[in-house]
Amino acid sequence: MIDAGIYVHVPYCRRKCLYCDFFSGGYKTADWEGFVRCIINEYNERRGEISGKADTLYIGGGTPSLMPDTPFRSLLRFLIDNISWGIGKREISLEVNPEDVSEEKARMWKREGVNRVSMGVQSFNDDELMRVGRRHDSRRAIEAYDVLRKHLDNISIDLMFGLPGQTVESWEKSVETAVTLNPEHISAYSLMLEEGTPMTVLAEKGRIELPDDRLNDEMWRRLSVRLSESGYRQYEISNYSKQGYESKHNGKYWRQVPYLGLGPSAHSYDGDRERRFNPPDITGYLKRFGSGQEGREPFYRREMLTDEEIKEEYILTRMRVSEGINLSDFRERFGKAAEERLLHNLMTLPNQELVENKEGNISLSSDGIMVADSVILALAM
């Protein structure tokens, strides 16, 4: 049995980035001790939902690197002491922003058990950072990386392409800076205009100019070539790593592995057919778990997946990773009729060069990755 993962959502930010639709609230009024107490109470109430062991803990947000030292230590020490860990190496990840990194914090994070950090850089171009509402500049990002490198040997950098005013040349410079820093892992995401975000409003009003699809495709191509030349392997559509440094935790989301999500807006999955969603409600969360009284109504909302939904999710997530879908495993899970339907969908794709079928594994080709959403949806029909 594959070990589960634990996710903790820290819902506080200094200021929301213009493109972000993740759930978060202002940090100035945050009751950090109360929040940590609620996470502990929720874990104690729900720990039985994970029947086996866990081998990953991911603290994301929001901006968890905002958390002061004392409540952070309390949270991490409790979780490390109380999670039923598997026998393999633990991966304990923390999302950080460059402006929060200091020698003292990095030393404390490492001392308390963090062994992987994911730093949201997005760009090494100061104009691009300003346009999307980031608080750091490129120099601060590089300084933060250098500090983290003194204390940690597993660092991931997040980059974004398709930003307002971004060019292929400025993107190449950001990628080159990231490669020069030599992190173990690089994630690269295309800017998505999410409904209701300030970035979407600005775009709809014509106040910002975004790169078109042709430029976005060229940025992705140049990224992939440069990272491949530098020893990074693309193991998922948006993720590249040095050998052995793939994100163990995120891999659980793509491979139908159970995980428990704690905190407002966090979601969980039992590895079979049940998903649970915590509402995006900080006040309600603090009220529900502040007292530590068990036996009340669950805070989360349940969703039971149908057989068809389970199959569709399997296709949608497995086709994101480099190994793709193993046909033997697919047939064992869903039956021969489902396999024949998948193969029929594969054979009727307008362009057969978008998907590779090698030794019983179906995966996206490099051209297929460029149009991944449409290809994967066609296979899942």
Whereabouts are the PLM-identified features?
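C-terminal scaffold of the Radical SAM
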Residues: 2-3, 24-46, 53-336
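Local cysteine-cluster metal-coordination motifs and their immediate loop/turn environment
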Residues: 11-24
